[in-house]
Amino acid sequence: RACIELGEDCDGYKDDCQCCRDNAFCSCYEFFGEKNGCGCAVGH
């Protein structure tokens, strides 16, 4: 399956952002209700 490496962009709408790492997720910041700067990040 295709997966996204840590630090790569993700769309912010898939909970796991199809990250290659099991404990990673799609981290975004919201700007006026829009998701921006989404990237694959490791959960804490």
From Swiss-Prot:
Signal peptide residues on this chain, from the entry's feature table: none
GO molecular function: calcium channel regulator activity; toxin activity
This protein's GO CC annotations: extracellular region
Keywords: Calcium channel impairing toxin, Disulfide bond, Ion channel impairing toxin, Knottin, Neurotoxin, Secreted, Toxin, Voltage-gated calcium channel impairing toxin
Cystine bridges: 3-20, 10-26, 19-40, 28-38
Keyword Disulfide bond: yes
Keyword presence, Transmembrane: no
Known tissue expression: Expressed by the venom gland.
InterPro entries: Omega-agatoxin_II/III_CS (IPR005853), Toxin_34 (IPR013605)
Pfam families named among the record's database cross-references: Toxin_34
Subcellular location: Secreted
Function comment: Omega-agatoxins are antagonists of voltage-sensitive calcium channels (Cav). Toxic to mice by intracerebroventricular injection.
Family: Belongs to the neurotoxin 04 (omega-agtx) family. 03 (type II/III omega-agtx) subfamily.
Free-text comment on this protein's domains from its UniProt entry: The presence of a 'disulfide through disulfide knot' structurally defines this protein as a knottin.
Full protein name: U17-ctenitoxin-Co1a
Upper classification of the organism: Eukaryota, Metazoa, Ecdysozoa, Arthropoda, Chelicerata
